[in-house]
Each structure stands twice: as C-alpha cells, then as structure tokens.
Amino acid sequence: MESILSEERKCYICGSTRWLERHHIYGGANRPKSEKYGLVVYLCHWCHNEPPNGVHFNKERMRWLREEGQRAFQKRYPDLDFLAIFRHNYL
C-alpha cells in the first residue's frame, strides 16, 4: 500500500529526493501491519540508516516518526483501534 503520510517521493524528514529508501514506521512483528495500513515513508539514506541521525540510530527521530504514524492512522482509520492493532500508544 502507498503511504498515508505523504504522497511525495521525497525524504519525509529532510525533503531530499536523492538515494531514497522505503521505511516501515513500525518494524519487527508490526512490519506487515505497517505495509497493510500505509504506515511507510520514504527516507533518504542519511535520515534512514546513517548514524547519528538516521531513524535506526536516533531514538528521538524514531519516536517522532512513530507519533506521526499513529496520528495519520487515527485520522485515516477513525473506526479502528490503533492500540489493539499495534499494541502500543506513541502519543
């Protein structure tokens, strides 16, 4: 599924259009759910996988992105219970 957070093919964090990678906001066991509900964004390689600021190395950025994901989910799917599906409240 396409992203419910952004229709643009650019880094969700910095806006770059170079070296983009698709990031599932909720990984691990929740990765298929991220895909199902459109909780994916494009990130440039530096904002995705490079220390110290890539989301996989920076807890604050990861937390912010998960908050953004939950807000987008609740707006798009008002009849679904985010907590019941993802087992965590990020807000």
Question: Where on the chain are the PLM-derived regions?
Answer:
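Histidine-centered catalytic micro-motifs
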Residues: 20-28, 44-51
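Short linker/helix segments within small regulatory modules
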Residues: 26-40
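Short Cys/His-centered divalent metal-binding micro-motifs
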Residues: 40-64
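Short flanking/linker segments adjacent to small metal-binding domains or redox-active Cys/His motifs
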Residues: 67-91
